[in-house]
Regions:
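Extracellular glycan-recognition regions
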Residues: 1-99
Length: 99
């Protein structure tokens, strides 16, 4: 699973992709078009849930999906530009932590 903000046709979207034999992409209008966005992933038994927030307090669920209970969850950051000339990215005040 990967989750984050995606720029599609000039608009920012909250994006979650699950891959288990095939990929399943879910999007919704991002919680903030210009400001900071917090992401949280919650694991419960054999599923994970991707949530985002514009204030780090109130989170909205974007997608929940199957994730085998015996598989370790790993987290990291990335940027990608599958089309065009690319872009500059800045991660500011980045924190990765477990609950």
């Amino acid at each position: 699973m990967k989750c984050g903000s995606e720029l599609v046709e000039g608009k920012r979207w909250a994006s979650v992709v699950f891959t288990h034999d095939y990929s399943d992409w879910s999007t919704m209008e991002d919680v903030s078009q210009t400001g900071a966005v917090w992401w949280r992933v919650v694991r419960t038994k054999d599923s994970i849930e991707a949530q985002c927030s514009k204030d780090g307090e109130k989170f909205t669920t974007i997608r929940q999906g199957y994730f085998p209970a015996d598989v370790k969850v790993m987290a990291g950051v990335m940027c990608a530009a599958p089309e065009g000339a690319g872009f500059d990215a800045k991660f500011d005040q980045l924190t990765l932590k477990t609950a």
